Amino acid sequence: MAKHSDPNSKLIAENRRARFDYFIEEEIEAGIMLLGSEVKSLRQGGSNIGESYASVEEGELWLINGYIAPYLQAKTWGHEERRKRKLLVSRRELARLWTATAREGMTIVPIRMYFNDRGIVKLKIGIAKGKKLSDKRETSAKRDWSREKQRLLKQNS
């Protein structure tokens, strides 16, 4: 019997707070320029994108404050854990991202980092608008109600 690869098994890191803190308007897949020791560290699962963001600087897209743990078997100089990493998108997508962030209140948020089918590290980024506290409460209330509804349906059936 053939093994089916689970898409979540290729997941490296996920920004779980992104959908809670932001309204994600559009998602874009971007490549990321990494060093060899960074890729090896990602294969071991040492990454965190929860506090990171992306920005367009001098006509290029950069991931800022993304954490990749040091690879222990690397040579002594290894890599810097929180360095700026260049994101690879097409010129059309870059122009769209730049115009989106030029609008007030819009930002580029990393959503998920994963290996694609060819084993290349990809980053799913989203054009997002920050939620206010009342929006967060509304999202939380909807989620709680849907859980309660599912629990009641399960009890009654």
Curated annotation (Swiss-Prot):
GO terms for biological process, alphabetical: trans-translation
The keyword RNA-binding is annotated on this UniProt entry: yes
Sequence intervals crossing the membrane: none
Coiled-coil intervals: none
Family the UniProt entry places it in: Belongs to the SmpB family.
Role noted for this protein: Required for rescue of stalled ribosomes mediated by trans-translation. Binds to transfer-messenger RNA (tmRNA), required for stable association of tmRNA with ribosomes. tmRNA and SmpB together mimic tRNA shape, replacing the anticodon stem-loop with SmpB. tmRNA is encoded by the ssrA gene; the 2 termini fold to resemble tRNA(Ala) and it encodes a 'tag peptide', a short internal open reading frame. During trans-translation Ala-aminoacylated tmRNA acts like a tRNA, entering the A-site of stalled ribosomes, displacing the stalled mRNA.
HAMAP family in the record: SmpB
Protein name from the UniProt record: SsrA-binding protein
Origin organism lineage: Bacteria, Pseudomonadati, Pseudomonadota, Alphaproteobacteria, Rhodobacterales
